[in-house]
Curated annotation (Swiss-Prot):
Subcellular location: Cell inner membrane
Catalytic activity, EC: 7.5.2.7
Organism from which the protein derives: Vibrio parahaemolyticus serotype O3:K6 (strain RIMD 2210633)
Protein name per its UniProtKB record: Ribose import ATP-binding protein RbsA
Catalytic activity: D-ribose(out) + ATP + H2O = D-ribose(in) + ADP + phosphate + H(+)
KW Cell division (keyword) present: no
The keyword Lyase is annotated on this UniProt entry: no
Entry-linked PROSITE patterns: ABC_TRANSPORTER_1 (PS00211), ABC_TRANSPORTER_2 (PS50893), RBSA (PS51254)
One cellular-component annotation, GO: plasma membrane
SUPFAM superfamilies hit by this protein: P-loop containing nucleoside triphosphate hydrolases
Recorded topology in the membrane: Peripheral membrane protein
A GO molecular function held by the record: ATP binding
Pfam families: ABC_tran
Family: Belongs to the ABC transporter superfamily. Ribose importer (TC 3.A.1.2.1) family.
Gene that this sequence comes from: rbsA
């Protein structure tokens, strides 16, 4: 194999109470795509932060283009030709696309004036390369999350980088946007660029990557060619054991109807009706922009409804705020856990109990003893990997943050639990744990709505499935009668109704 353009060797990094990296290594080769795999908490993000100078390593070495390297920070590594596209976007909604791409390095003339036309033309060229249909004069805030991700990628391309690190780049992308990204990755590969591709989507790894490096518990487990392994072998390397059934669905006798929605119309939702029983998992499928999240937010009270009826336990409710939703007994776990779900600067305990303070308060006093017992119970039940309950949640891995977000909803003791993309950005091992928790809630008689863009997840975990297109329900199926082909047909607007009688 060619000489590596970038080598991270036996990197060590410790934080109070946890050794994040324990002799972790990574090689990046020119003209090849290296997948960096591992469960949440395996050390992938920490390794990238050591590389780009955000963290200082305790031991180990970095070689870049055959020379020892130590970067002072992301700007330093970027100027050297190493760009990183983070999972959390680093963009400003109030600026145009072009201003975001060239922020801090605007094109200027001899008098120091910004050469706007030249800057917009170059930004438009980058957008065209990524098949983004917007003018670079468009405000970033007017773009969808997926389109904003493409702007972040355009920004990395503008540096003419020799190494590009992509952290979950397709998480918020549509299938079409993912295809455009893969075309660009192939172009970069042909130009000799070395790419690090971090993703939990195994299908993508086998489609776009050449090599795989696996980390587990901060340790280097191995490097192999994609052609020399398969999904089962890769999962075993990542989790250290074989995963049996991927979707552990259980059969539970359903109780009475808990939630009934009739003719609901609101923000992005048109004339939606459905029911949900106790002990039932109702899957909601559809393409990006179909209105799934909007429907959940209208039911929860985070978006306004125009007309229609929501009945909970045979009583009509009219939630006009998330507080109403919680008070009614509806918990909504957002798809955007870092934007809507969690306060990253607060501790695990504070995040978990934030929405349940009324249940932990007597008079005006928070019952801290009860709070600690409840939080510790959830940490144990959910197998949340944290040194203590007082750990700042921003320091936890994505999978553990997601478990805290779900626990936060359950602390309110809801009748209906809405899970919007509960396993997005979560590794295969943590996914299995989340599925097992969902089954536990189901067995306890809780009513669950599972919104997911992953059709196998909806098919594997749901009892019944609704499909949405342009804010309307275009299909309803019993899980045993559904398959990906039927769901996709409904997702693009073809009406089917095959619910079992």
């Amino acid at each position: 194999m060619t000489q590596a353009i970038l080598q991270l060797s036996e990197i060590e990094k410790a934080f109070p109470g946890v050794k994040a990296l324990d002799k972790a290594s990574l090689n990046v080769y020119p003209g090849r795509v290296m997948a960096l795999m591992g469960e949440n908490g395996a050390g992938k993000s920490t390794l990238m932060k050591v590389l780009t100078g955000i963290y200082h390593m305790d031991a180990g070495s970095i070689q870049y283009q055959g020379q020892p390297a130590a970067f002072k920070g992301p700007r330093d590594s970027q100027e050297a030709g190493i760009s990183i596209i983070h999972q959390e976007l680093n963009l400003i909604p109030e600026l145009t696309i072009a201003e975001n791409i060239f922020l801090g390095r605007e094109f200027t003339g001899s008098m120091g004036r910004i050469q706007w036309s030249k800057m917009y033309a170059e930004a438009d060229r980058l957008l065209q390369r990524l098949n983004v249909k917007h003018s670079s004069k468009t405000l970033l805030g007017d773009l969808s999350l997926g389109e904003q991700q493409m702007v972040e990628i355009a920004k990395a391309l503008s540096f003419e980088s020799k190494v590009i690190i992509m952290d979950e780049p397709t998480d918020a992308l549509t299938d079409t946007e993912t295809e455009s990204l893969f075309k660009v990755i192939n172009e970069l590969r042909e130009q000799g660029c070395g790419i690090v591709y971090i993703s939990h989507r195994l299908k993508e790894i086998f489609e776009i990557c050449d090599d795989i490096t696996v980390l587990r518990d901060g340790k280097f487990i191995g490097e192999c060619r994609v052609a020399d392994t398969d999904e089962d072998g890769l999962i075993e390397m990542m989790v250290g054991r074989k995963l049996e059934e991927q979707y552990p669905r259980i059969d539970v006798k359903h109780g009475e109807t808990c939630l009934e929605v009739v003719g609901l119309t609101g923000s992005g939702v048109h004339d939606v009706s459905f029911t949900l029983k106790r002990g039932e998992i109702l899957g909601i499928s559809g393409l990006m922009g179909a209105g799934r999240t909007e429907l959940m937010k209208v039911i929860y009270g985070a978006l306004p409804s125009e007309h229609g009826v929501i009945n909970l336990d045979n009583k009509t409710i009219n939630p006009v705020s998330p507080q109403d939703g919680l008070a009614n007994g509806i918990a909504y776990i957002s798809e955007d856990r870092k934007g809507d779900g969690l306060v990253l600067g607060l501790s695990v305990k504070e995040n978990m109990s934030l929405c349940a303070l009324d249940k932990l308060t007597k008079g005006v006093q928070i019952q801290h003893g009860e709070e600690v017992i409840a939080v510790e119970d959830f940490i144990k039940l959910f197998n949340i990997k944290t040194p203590t309950r007082d750990q700042i949640i921003g320091n936890l891995s994505g999978g553990n943050q997601q478990k805290v977000a779900i626990a936060k909803g359950l602390m309110t003791k809801p009748k209906v639990l809405i899970l919007d993309e509960p396993t997005r950005g979560v590794d295969v091992g943590a996914k299995k744990e989340i599925y097992q928790l969902i089954n536990k809630f189901k067995a306890d008689g809780m009513s669950i709505i599972l919104v997911s863009s992953e059709m196998p997840e909806v098919l594997g975990m749901s009892d019944r499935i609704l499909v949405m297109h342009e804010g309307r329900i275009t299909g309803e199926f019993d899980a045993k009668d559904a398959d990906q082909e039927k769901l996709l047909a409904c997702a693009v607007g073809k009406k089917i109704n095959e619910e079992a009688a």
